[in-house]
A protein has these predicted regions:
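A short alpha-helical cap/connector motif
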Residues: 107-120
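Phosphate-bearing ligand-interacting subdomains
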Residues: 36-109
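Short, solvent-exposed amphipathic alpha-helical segments in soluble enzyme
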Residues: 19-24, 75-77
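NAD(P)-binding Rossmann-fold cofactor-contacting core
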Residues: 22-40
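Short hydrophobic segments within beta-strands
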Residues: 5-6, 32, 61
Length: 121
């Protein structure tokens, strides 16, 4: 399955660095970003017309939970079937898949994932 990183910013670059450094088997098609065009990290920035939403995993490479919620709703509107969130942790180093090693699956988060706040006193 091919994948796209949604977010050509700081965490998108970190995701790309993890992906290239560890030589994962997943195929990176490109980045998506609502504000950028051209290339990012030498990878093309693609549009919805460039991907098959039924066969392409979209990895949200943003850390702000409010922005993640907005992106998630956009992905649902486009009927993306394979949604992941890059969490910047390699918690299963035995896998050769970027999606299972570096991300959490979000395809079943529901209609409206809400960000949560934690307060530590």
């Amino acid at each position: 399955m091919g994948m796209v990183f949604y977010g050509a910013g700081y965490f998108g670059k970190i995701a790309w660095e993890h992906y290239t450094k560890k030589k994962y088997a997943d195929r990176l098609i490109g980045f998506m970003d609502g504000k950028k065009t051209g290339q990012y990290c030498g990878v093309p920035i693609v549009s919805w017309n460039d991907i098959d939403v039924t066969k392409t995993a979209v990895v949200i490479t943003v850390q702000n939970p409010y922005v993640v919620s907005q992106i998630y709703r956009e992905l649902q509107n486009y009927k993306v079937q394979h949604i992941f969130w890059f969490i910047n942790l390699n918690w299963t180093e035995t896998s050769n898949s970027f999606l299972s090693s570096e991300c959490i699956e979000g395809s079943n988060w529901g209609a409206c994932p809400m960000p949560q706040a934690e307060i530590h006193v």
